[in-house]
């Protein structure tokens, strides 16, 4: 195992240059193998989990879902607040910010972005809850792609560019996740569920996030400041893939199916959330349920 870690580290260092010494020794960051292992385990569970649950009753998980989603809401709120205040403290430049001129603000950003990276590991639980509740229609290519790529991308970000221009996407995403996880936490409470109205706007906000992140990243290409351009080009490319996938989800879910869902008497005016309405699965309405995009 140690030999494999050394070979991977040598290969990455030869490709990408020296790592940022400020994160040396941090949990999960010194070696890529733990992150890769978590990813492989995640993909295996995605593949095997639905098979295991095929002939079993769905698990409600309602109480756990409330706690889980509210915990991620609070974590996202903390990360958003810390990033905004740290960026303000360091006088970060919106158009381009290097990784070493922010002083103590850079250290604050690095600390928060480690939590952001770690939160992507926690968010694997989103998929596991879908499997336990037999909401397999929500385990889409978009959902899986978004989850496993974010964890791996942010391992590399944290090792080579853990502050500076890397802050923007994480800040905006943390804000969106405050809205998203609060929605899904509240939607697990039957008495509150009928009053939730902002799910559609979460997807719109995610699309705005990707577009603005791509624009902000492009600014650093046009007006360089020393932030590695290879990272900028990769970020732009990744944002394009997310814009395409999320746009397709939005069109399929809200444009083409919106009219049909309104006419479906089985919903009785209450939208299905995560495959449940009033806390009970209604498997007869699979075709009309909306998938999460996170």
UniProtKB/Swiss-Prot annotation:
Keywords noted in UniProt: Cell projection, Endoplasmic reticulum, Fatty acid biosynthesis, Fatty acid metabolism, Lipid biosynthesis, Lipid metabolism, Membrane, Transferase, Transmembrane, Transmembrane helix
Gene Ontology molecular function, alphabetical: fatty acid elongase activity
Catalytic activity, as annotated: a very-long-chain acyl-CoA + malonyl-CoA + H(+) = a very-long-chain 3-oxoacyl-CoA + CO2 + CoA; (6Z,9Z,12Z)-octadecatrienoyl-CoA + malonyl-CoA + H(+) = (8Z,11Z,14Z)-3-oxoeicosatrienoyl-CoA + CO2 + CoA; (9Z,12Z,15Z)-octadecatrienoyl-CoA + malonyl-CoA + H(+) = (11Z,14Z,17Z)-3-oxoeicosatrienoyl-CoA + CO2 + CoA; (9Z)-hexadecenoyl-CoA + malonyl-CoA + H(+) = 3-oxo-(11Z)-octadecenoyl-CoA + CO2 + CoA
Membrane topology value: Multi-pass membrane protein
A cellular component term, taken from the record's GO annotations: endoplasmic reticulum membrane
Transmembrane segments: 26-46, 64-84, 112-132, 141-161, 172-192, 207-227, 231-251
GO term, biological process aspect, one: sphingolipid biosynthetic process
Biased composition annotated in UniProt, kind: Polar residues: 274-286
Pfam families in UniProt: ELO
UniProt xrefs under InterPro entries: ELO_fam, ELOVL5
Similarity comment: family membership: Belongs to the ELO family. ELOVL5 subfamily.
Alphabetical list of HAMAP family matching this protein: VLCF_elongase_5 (MF_03205)
Protein name (Swiss-Prot/TrEMBL): Very long chain fatty acid elongase 5
Species this chain originates from: Tachysurus fulvidraco
Gene that produces this protein: ELOVL5
């Amino acid at each position: 195992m140690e030999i494999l870690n050394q070979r991977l580290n040598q290969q990455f260092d030869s490709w990408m240059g020296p790592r940022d010494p400020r994160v040396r020794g941090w949990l999960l960051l010194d070696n890529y193998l733990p992150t890769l292992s978590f990813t492989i385990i995640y993909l295996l569970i995605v593949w095997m989990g639905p098979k295991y649950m095929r002939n079993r009753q769905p698990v409600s998980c309602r109480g756990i879902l409330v706690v889980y989603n509210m915990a991620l809401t609070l974590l996202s709120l903390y990360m958003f607040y810390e990033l905004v205040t740290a960026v303000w403290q360091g006088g970060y430049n919106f158009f381009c910010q290097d990784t070493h001129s922010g002083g103590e603000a850079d250290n604050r950003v690095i600390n928060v972005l480690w939590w952001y990276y770690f939160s992507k590991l926690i968010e694997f639980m989103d998929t596991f809850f879908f499997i336990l509740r037999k909401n397999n229609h929500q385990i889409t290519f978009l959902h899986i792609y978004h989850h496993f790529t974010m964890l791996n991308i942010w391992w590399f970000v944290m090792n080579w560019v853990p502050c500076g221009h890397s802050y923007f996407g994480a800040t905006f995403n943390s804000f969106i996740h405050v809205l998203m996880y609060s929605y899904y936490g509240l939607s697990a409470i039957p008495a509150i569920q009928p009053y939730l109205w902002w799910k559609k706007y979460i997807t719109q906000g995610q699309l705005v996030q990707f577009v603005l992140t791509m624009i902000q990243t492009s600014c650093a290409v046009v007006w360089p400041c020393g932030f590695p351009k290879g990272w900028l080009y990769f970020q732009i490319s990744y944002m394009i893939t997310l814009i395409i996938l999320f746009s397709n989800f939005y069109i399929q879910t809200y444009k083409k199916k919106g009219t049909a869902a309104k006419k479906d008497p089985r919903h009785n005016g209450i939208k299905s959330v995560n495959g449940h309405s009033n806390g009970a699965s209604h498997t007869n309405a699979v075709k009309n349920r909306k998938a999460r995009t996170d």
